[in-house]
């Protein structure tokens, strides 16, 4: 998950002027919860899957983002390992309206369509908790 850079990070580059005031510990917590889900359920995520977070992505924050979609990471791509190729994914935050739209037709093609719309404005799919624009 790529997030808006935080203000105290001297090595970060701003995307569209968005800057977070604090380190994105909420993103680490979200990824830990998703890892627990995968471990317990034995279900993994692939490109163009989505999942609700059942709460705002960051608790006690004014954000419309309540779920994540998974997309191929166009920057990192994939890596070849002795056990085969691994395609790297990234998560991007989605709003309730976008989540509801995906649930109407929960196919990878529909998620890909949403991701394509998002990439037009945000090619790196940076998750900005302050995002108010909805793509559907």
Predicted regions and their residues:
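Acidic, proline/glycine-rich low-complexity IDRs
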Residues: 1-136
């Amino acid at each position: 998950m790529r997030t808006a850079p935080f203000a105290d990070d001297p090595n970060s580059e701003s995307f569209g002027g968005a800057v977070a005031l604090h380190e994105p510990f909420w993103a680490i917590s979200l990824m830990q919860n998703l890892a627990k889900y995968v471990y317990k359920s034995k279900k993994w995520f692939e490109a163009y899957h989505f999942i609700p977070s059942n709460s705002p992505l960051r608790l006690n924050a004014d954000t419309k983002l309540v779920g994540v979609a998974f997309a191929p990471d166009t920057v990192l791509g994939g890596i070849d390992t002795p056990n085969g190729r691994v395609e790297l994914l990234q998560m991007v935050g989605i709003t309730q309206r976008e989540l509801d739209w995906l649930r109407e037709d929960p196919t990878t093609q529909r998620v890909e369509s949403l991701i394509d719309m998002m990439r037009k404005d945000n090619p790196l799919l940076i998750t900005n908790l302050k995002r108010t624009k909805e793509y559907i």
